[in-house]
Structures are given as structure tokens and as C-alpha cells.
């Protein structure tokens, strides 16, 4: 049960934070596109 090969020493909370920001960014772009009319057909 060693941590060898698990992305170095990056803490789990940091990975979760970055992943959350990326998800919010993608969702924000999607809704912005829908609001702008690019995806209004949805």
C-alpha cells in the first residue's frame, strides 16, 4: 500500500478543487453558448 506512482505528492483536495473548477468552467461555457444562441435549440 505505497503511494509510488500516484501522481507524486499532490494532495487529494487540490485535485478535487482543480477538477471542480474545470467542470464549472465547462458548464459555464456551455450555458453561455446556450444563452448566446449557439445552443438555444437545446
Curated annotation (Swiss-Prot):
GO BP terms in the entry: photosynthesis
Gene Ontology cellular component annotations, sorted alphabetically: chloroplast thylakoid membrane; photosystem II reaction center
Subcellular location: Plastid, Chloroplast thylakoid membrane
Keyword terms: Chloroplast, Membrane, Photosynthesis, Photosystem II, Plastid, Reaction center, Thylakoid, Transmembrane, Transmembrane helix
Membrane topology: Single-pass membrane protein
Domain of life of the native organism: Eukaryota
Residue spans crossing the bilayer: 10-30
SUPFAM superfamilies listed in its UniProt record: Photosystem II reaction center protein J, PsbJ
InterPro entries referenced in this protein's UniProt entry, alphabetically: PSII_PsbJ (IPR002682), PSII_PsbJ_sf (IPR037267)
Entry function: One of the components of the core complex of photosystem II (PSII). PSII is a light-driven water:plastoquinone oxidoreductase that uses light energy to abstract electrons from H(2)O, generating O(2) and a proton gradient subsequently used for ATP formation. It consists of a core antenna complex that captures photons, and an electron transfer chain that converts photonic excitation into a charge separation.
Complexes and interactors: PSII is composed of 1 copy each of membrane proteins PsbA, PsbB, PsbC, PsbD, PsbE, PsbF, PsbH, PsbI, PsbJ, PsbK, PsbL, PsbM, PsbT, PsbX, PsbY, PsbZ, Psb30/Ycf12, at least 3 peripheral proteins of the oxygen-evolving complex and a large number of cofactors. It forms dimeric complexes.
HAMAP family, sorted: PSII_PsbJ
Family: Belongs to the PsbJ family.
Protein name (database record): Photosystem II reaction center protein J
Originating organism: Chara vulgaris (Common stonewort)
Lineage: Eukaryota, Viridiplantae, Streptophyta, Charophyceae, Charales
Gene (name only): psbJ
Amino acid at each position: 500500500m505505497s503511494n509510488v506512482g500516484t501522481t507524486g505528492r499532490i494532495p487529494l483536495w487540490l485535485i478535487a478543487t482543480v477538477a471542480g473548477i474545470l467542470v464549472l468552467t465547462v458548464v459555464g461555457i456551455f450555458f453561455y453558448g446556450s444563452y448566446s444562441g449557439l445552443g438555444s435549440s437545446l
